[in-house]
Each structure stands twice: as structure tokens, then as C-alpha cells.
Amino acid sequence: MYEGVVQDLIDELGRLPGVGPKSAQRIAFHILQAEPTDVRRLAQCLMEVKAKVRFCATCGNVAQEELCNICRDPRRDLSVICVVEEPKDVVAIERTREFRGKYHVLGGAISPIEGVGPDDLRIRELLARLADGTVTELILATDPNLEGEATATYLARMIKPMGLKVTRLASGLPVGGDLEYADEVTLGRAFEGRRLLDV
């Protein structure tokens, strides 16, 4: 244990996802040894992100305006929506350059153990987007784990009566893995080989 503010910094850094106690300590000491201008720039960036970034009113992706760059892009295919759990999944898919449609970010996955049900996700907003008949295909790109599969099955059953083509990313993604960690080639092939969901 360190004194006062040093330990406070280590504790706060350790609360970040994927940062364990040793990494938190290493980052804290890097900050302590950094130039004051670098530390101020980091602090300013953190404050600006918190103040300026919001969620897109249409898809739920991160944005600095009411709509994200993807929803504002007129070159995107309006007939296909790819449903993902989190904004970081949008970034992973965009890196593949395989998908030219729009996205819908649910804000998580159905997880009874964590107390997350369908009403806690952006499913109503998705249904509202599908209501005008523009969308012909819905790609379910939730994580290939228990919660992601449950969410995909729930959505497929709910949307099937609408007559839309509902597909799921092909295998090649590790079961139990997170979409954000898949490499571009694997994710690109999963898009190319997506399958029709029959529920």
C-alpha cells in the first residue's frame, strides 16, 4: 500500500476493466514520472470525453452530435441493420470493411444472472426502426456466448413475424468470446458466411 493520493490513483485505475492491481500500479507510476503537460493533456482528454460524447439518438453508438458518423453517412445501405451489444462491437466490425449497412447497439445482452432482461436493452428502439419497412435484413452480431445467443434467439423470435430476413454471423468466432477481440479476417469471414436464423 502506498500513501494517500498515490494509492487513490492506483485504486481508481484498478477499477477500469481489464486493469489488475499490478497494471494499475504500473500506470500510476508512469503518470507520476510523466511530464506535467502530458498528465494535463490526459486529464483534459478524459474530461472532454465525458462532457462531449453521448449516444446516437438512432442507433445507440457513441457520437459527439445527435447522430453518429455512420447514421449520418448517406452512402450506407439503409436496408440492412447489424445488431450488436456494445459500441466497441461497431468498431470491431467497421475494421473489417465488410459491412456497409447501419447498426443498432442494444447496450448489453440478456443476462438473468446479472438481472438484465429485454426491457433493459434498446429493443423497443430497434422495433421502431423496423416499423417503416425500409429494412429487409437484420444481422444479429451479438457475442458468441450464452448471453449473446439468448439475446439473438429472443430477437429472432420477436422479429420473425415481421417477415424480415434474420441472419447470424457464421462460426469462426470463438464460443464464449467477445466480438471486439476477433481479428479483422475472422470477423470478415463471419460476415460473409452468416446464416439464416430459423426459429
From Swiss-Prot:
Top-level lineage group: Bacteria
InterPro entries: DNA_Rcmb_RecR, Rcmb_RecR, Rcmb_RecR_Znf, TOPRIM_dom, TOPRIM_RecR
Positions of C4-type zinc fingers: 56-71
Keywords, comma-separated and alphabetical: DNA damage, DNA recombination, DNA repair, Metal-binding, Zinc, Zinc-finger
Biological processes per GO annotation: DNA recombination; DNA repair
The keyword Zinc is assigned to this record: yes
Location of the Toprim domain: 79-174
NCBIfam families membership: recR
Similarity comment: Belongs to the RecR family.
Role description: May play a role in DNA repair. It seems to be involved in an RecBC-independent recombinational process of DNA repair. It may act with RecF and RecO.
Identification of the protein by name: Recombination protein RecR
Organism this protein belongs to: Streptomyces avermitilis (strain ATCC 31267 / DSM 46492 / JCM 5070 / NBRC 14893 / NCIMB 12804 / NRRL 8165 / MA-4680)
Gene that encodes the chain: recR
